[in-house]
UniProtKB/Swiss-Prot annotation:
GO terms for cellular component: cytosol; riboflavin synthase complex. This is 6,7-dimethyl-8-ribityllumazine synthase. NCBIfam families: lumazine-synth. It holds the Pfam family DMRL_synthase. It comes from Prochlorococcus marinus subsp. pastoris (strain CCMP1986 / NIES-2087 / MED4). The keyword Kinase does not apply.
Length: 158
């Protein structure tokens, strides 16, 4: 029996794309910061001259799938991280954005055989979003760990 697992020790061999929603940028900037910190601590070059990392900004979480799809046509990425923050309001817009963003990201991942980490916070309030993007608990770090694991796993399987 062969057991395959992803590695958390070295991200330096990965080509990573990050697509970030600008809407609720108070939150998404913090998540991105946590994500980049994790990638850097695991060996990925996150400098402005990095050849292993590309970051794309889009207006909102609804646009994440099309940007991820276009990014994957540009270069052979090992993994893409989609970051956003959708905070429930008084209308059903929240439900539509989350539903379409999650379906679209999954579809792009399956069509391109590249893992896309769903790093879109879905919260009922700004306070909840801030708690998930804060110093003590920044989910951006977790999303980056998932990316390292899945990127290395798929590379090993191929």
């Amino acid at each position: 029996m062969t057991i395959f697992e992803g590695s958390f020790t070295n991200a330096s061999t990965l080509k990573v794309g990050i697509v970030v929603a600008r809407f609720n940028d108070l939150i998404t900037n913090k998540i991105l910061s946590g994500c980049l910190d994790c990638l850097k601590r695991h060996g990925l070059d996150t400098s402005e001259t990095s050849k292993e990392l590309d970051i794309v900004w889009v207006p909102g979480s609804f646009e994440l799938p099309i940007a991820a799809k276009t990014l994957l046509k540009k270069t052979n990425y090992d993994v893409v991280i989609a970051l956003g923050a959708v905070i429930r309001g008084e209308t059903s817009h929240y439900d539509v954005v989350i539903s379409e963003a999650s379906k679209g990201i999954s579809q792009v991942s399956y069509e391109n055989n590249v893992p896309i980490i769903f790093g879109v916070l879905t919260t009922d309030s700004m306070q909840q979003a801030l708690e998930r993007a804060g110093i003590k608990n920044n989910l951006g770090w977790n999303y980056a760990l998932q990316a390292i694991e899945m990127g290395s796993l798929i590379k090993n399987l191929n």
